[in-house]
């Protein structure tokens, strides 16, 4: 079933090039997906190199079985636990690069049975790992209208959040929704105005998915984990797909790139400043966006943003 869903890796070469691969280095692909980035990293590693992949989606773990390479291993779990995985392997502070490709993957969106898409009818699930936590249907059934409003506004910036939340609660009182098509049609009916070229359920589905999977909290923990595992001069390469994700990545790199707060004019060397604490990363280059050619070939790439940072010596 996995092969039925094509996945085109976004910003493939750019994201891996930003890791500055060393042939004998140790790298982490924190979001294996269908292995596009992992395969390219492996192609650039020498026999002594090593790649650890992470994914919480059971289908991604199944897809990883196709990689028969002694340099490669994968862990089934959230990338937010990266620091713990690396500590168990005794590799804390020895990782030469971490790559994170955030958000939902094309196979997840395109498989109606996963319940992520408002364009294809399927069970109203939306979990990255269907074996854990509440499904979207279960959460919507028990949630109060105010809670739904908060989720739609916070994670989807949905201006008709109150109307949609009220419609969801009223519908679930009479006949609980269990299908994505039911929710998409309800949202469309509750939205008095439509954005041009955008389905009215786009923002709400994004918001519910982010909430169900604790995506933003997972990103924050993953970034902190990456910082703790990287070796000096180790690279962080992060692809985000919407403003909420990119804002977290941008703020994290900016915060970790700040020097210590000391009075101006003190005669301190760069090494002495770092010893005061506060500066652990430096941004590398400018953010990258996909080319027009890539967007034409893969329209889902259009909103992607790629940022890099480098670990500074302690």
Swiss-Prot record:
EC number: 2.1.1.199
Record localization: Cytoplasm
GO BP term (any one): rRNA base methylation
Residues that coordinate or bind S-adenosyl-L-methionine: 35-37, 55, 79, 101, 108
GO CC, any one term: cytoplasm
Alphabetical keyword list: Cytoplasm, Methyltransferase, rRNA processing, S-adenosyl-L-methionine, Transferase
InterPro entries: RsmH, SAM-dep_MeTrfase_MraW_recog, SAM-dependent_MTases_sf
Predominant cellular place of this UniProt entry's protein: cytoplasm
Protein name: Ribosomal RNA small subunit methyltransferase H
Species classification: Bacteria, Pseudomonadati, Pseudomonadota, Gammaproteobacteria, Enterobacterales
